[in-house]
Amino acid sequence: MPDPRFFQTLSPLTVAALAEHIGGEVVRGGEVIVSAVAPLSSADRGAIAFLGDRKFAAALAETKAGCVIVPPSAVDAAPADAAVIVSSEAQAAWARASALLHRPVRLDRAITAAQAAEDDTVVVEPGVVLGEGVRIGRGSRIGANTVIGPGVQIGRDCLISSGVTVGFALLGDRVKLLAGARIGEAGFGAAGSKTGPVDIPQLGRVILQDGVTVGANSCIDRGAYDDTVIGENTKIDNLVMIGHNCVIGRNNLMAAHTGISGSVTSGDNCIFGGRAGVGDHITIGEGARVAAGGGVLADIPPGEIWSGYPAKPLRQFLRETVWLSKQASQKKGAKESKE
């Protein structure tokens, strides 16, 4: 169930009513009532889940979901005790269901600094807007014209600079957010459909653990359902993008213009050079390094240094670069001798 501090759960619907709204066909269990969406792996009897890819067939067989949305080819694989909706656009149908069952808590009214602060050591500069349920730990400072969305929890001795927005997030102690940082915006998720891409509601959170620094104008998206987590003492430079569902380890360093796609996991003590890019669902091992400009399309084992595009182990990259340079020089020399 999405965190109620950040998401409102709307009225439950029967499977039949839901199918009518999302463009699916009920196979069985139209009278079943569902009140939430969830992934196959964590869904309970009150939730609706979907199968978007055959590689998750095992999760479908084991799910506890009260209802599942499946493509026509997977109807027979659905659990016998679950209601079933069939759709050729299962993920898009699930996205539509999510919008019918959950809604982000909006900043309809603000509270005062005194209501949010743990004590009088908290400093809130002019122009700050604080949503309902915000809590700010002692010794923290919120910069001018920053907006803190409903339910956000900020730890002690934090420094949030001017023009920052924070929503759907939990911040530990000693967190620093520099000017213009964007924490907790919706992740980039869209499901294909015959009528065009459908936005997938992002129902997770951002968790910034103790000692995290986020540079100016950097963005960290909230999770699609699970959380985006930045580990203790990780330092993020200006203009860095971290996608939804990422789990970044402790003591990571990310130089400017690094881009981390969704669902990336990094171990502790990893380093990313400037303009490094990491593809989605990649695992970066503990202590690994990505050189500046590297484009990572495969998992990196612990302790290795990778470079280039597509990124590969540094020594291999250097050998190949030298070989290519020699080949180019030989061809150039042969061409000049003919002339």
Where are these regions (language model features)?
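Terminal amphipathic alpha-helical/low-complexity segments used for targeting or macromolecular assembly
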Residues: 1-115, 174, 180-181, 186-198, ...
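Structural signal for interior beta-strand "rungs" in well-ordered beta-sheet cores
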Residues: 50, 111-313
